[in-house]
Design a protein with these regions (language model features):
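Acidic/histidine-rich, surface-exposed loop or edge segments in extracytoplasmic proteins
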Residues: 8-21, 108-118
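A cross-family detector of function-defining hotspots
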Residues: 30-208
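Membrane-interface motif at the C-terminal end of an N-terminal transmembrane signal
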Residues: 1-3
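Short, flexible active-site loop motifs that bind/organize anionic cofactors or intermediates
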Residues: 20-23, 123
């Protein structure tokens, strides 16, 4: 598989920032993304039951060079703002995975335009193996295994993780944040999840 078009779109700068697909993570806003991608970008407030939720923007199909797939932008928004937007939402609709999508008011959508892009995920339409990822991006700094067998390859220099499913039923997901935020936003949650998976596995072995 050729991921050449994807890697060409990633530029890390000296101060720990990152530009992916023309968007500077941590600096550009939802308004910047709308200006770049137009009406095909779909912003939404999404949340699971009992959660405050998150502001996301989806674009599918999204073309990254020669590879197309699904692009999801995530944003830095305070819990207070998210709670207020959710309470004022007129209605919501159910999505897959127990997630609900909330209709934001016109005023809240205007406020959301100023939210800074914290990171993004790109799921290529083609299936990628761990070997494909290594061939394109080189040896990862670290590899972690999650409870569901997903292997996550970590590339802190370009603020990227590649989550490769064990079964091949789902597609490989590439996640990007600014390299300066890599440990806090991506690595720390992954390490915690991998440790929990390892502990659960050890416990299961001990009881068998």
């Amino acid at each position: 598989h050729d991921l050449h078009g994807v890697t060409l779109a990633v530029i890390a700068d000296a101060d720990g920032g990152l530009t992916v697909f023309g968007l500077n993570l941590g600096r550009d806003t939802l308004a910047s993304a709308k200006a770049r991608f137009g009406d095909t970008l779909q912003p939404a407030l999404v949340a699971r039951l009992g959660e405050v939720g998150a502001l996301e923007a989806l674009m599918e199909p999204f073309s990254a060079g020669f590879v197309s797939g699904r692009l999801v932008l995530s944003f830095d928004v305070s819990a207070t703002s998210l709670q207020r937007w959710r309470e004022r939402a007129g209605k919501s609709e159910a999505m897959e995975g127990g997630v609900r999508r909330f209709d934001m008011t016109h005023e809240d959508r205007a406020e959301a335009d100023g939210a800074r892009i914290a990171g993004l995920s790109f799921v290529p339409g083609l299936k990628l193996s761990e070997a494909d990822v290594r061939q394109r991006f080189g040896e990862p700094a670290e590899t972690l295994t999650q409870a569901d067998g997903v292997r996550v390859l970590l590339y802190p220099a370009i603020g990227m993780t590649a989550a490769v499913p064990a079964s091949g039923k789902t597609r490989t997901a590439l996640q990007y944040v600014a390299p300066r935020d890599f440990n806090a936003r991506l690595r720390a949650p992954l390490v915690a999840a991998a440790a929990a998976a390892s502990a659960a596995s050890a416990s299961a072995s001990a009881t068998n």
